[in-house]
Amino acid sequence: ECLCRCSGLYFCLSVPEMMKSFYYPHRNAKNPINNADIIYTPDATVFKTDTSRPKLMDEKDWYDVDVITCAAPNLRKRPSNQFNQDNGDRSVKVSDKELLEIHKKRLTRILDVAALNGAEVVILGAFGCGAFQNKPEVVARAAKEAMADYLHAFKTIEFAVYCPPRDDT
């Protein structure tokens, strides 16, 4: 969400062809697990600060990033809400083993796309550990296992995971 607030990414993702090929199929499936489809968005311009109230940066400070979009499983008890209206009406039951495989597949696809597009630095997010209630230990294990084949593919792999000030875990 942060990238959508601070850059032109939202506008790239909300064009009719993206809605038709990516978002509408997800919504029509009404499956909170979603799927491993990916959108690669090169050169999304970041023009606002990454703060609680983003501010327009001086144009000389703008920069471009390539973004890989892939949906995480939505494991909420009530997956549909005002932000995810088409994730189905019922929660899904998925074992930790099944969830691990889902995450490994998606993370591997993300890393494949990054490598194929010549990325030197990859920054991964929490991938469902926040609002979608995926278990952090399962996602972390999937990331560790998926990254094993990419240790020399990138100069840096980082995790940008938001932690509120009151949470020091």
Stretch-by-stretch model annotation:
Residues E1-T169:
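Macrodomain-like recognition of ADP-ribose-binding/processing modules
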